[in-house]
Amino acid sequence: KRFLQITVKDTDRQRECRMQEDKIRQEEQERKRKDISISINELKEIFLNLFSGKDQNGKEINAQRRGYLFEEFLKKLFLNEGIEVTEPFKIVGEQIDGSIKYDGEHYIIEAKWHDKWSASDSLYQFAAKVEGKMYGRGVFISVNGFSPDSVQALTTGKALRTILVDSWDLVPITEGMYNLREMLDNKIKVAQTMGRIYVDSTNLAD
């Protein structure tokens, strides 16, 4: 009996600790969101400048600098809508890695700014990374989209744990046509109900 009482107390204490940790993390996320709060117009300007190969001051930038600014854009985009960034975005060249918590689920994020479609090898590597996690889910962002063959190869006969995002999904967000949460909800719903991981979100603006 005494053992059961101690176990219950320990469990309650652990639960309280987890709740306190969650509260601290949420407060930190809210503080970060307020610190980097940015308007839609500012996000649009940043994104358009990146397409022109320039920073906000109109200065020409190289691929590594563009990757860094794209990382900043994504971080602001997520935090601005109160989406918890659970793993800081890391950048290697034009590749960005991190993770978010959305609608109670953790998603691994990978983003690339290449001058052409993302090919099959990149998607396969990311899919393997997602599948290696318990209940893993992923969001792969490729500014210039994905080749039809690579999307088909990834979805044929496989468990769908990844959704794909490109600039055609991001630009309308910066135009205020719909927000990031609406875009993610739409893509997740279509993936879960129709088995399609790469869909056009512009119908949300209708």
Model-derived features: where do they sit?
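Mixed-charge (Asp/Glu-Lys/Arg
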Residues: K1-D206
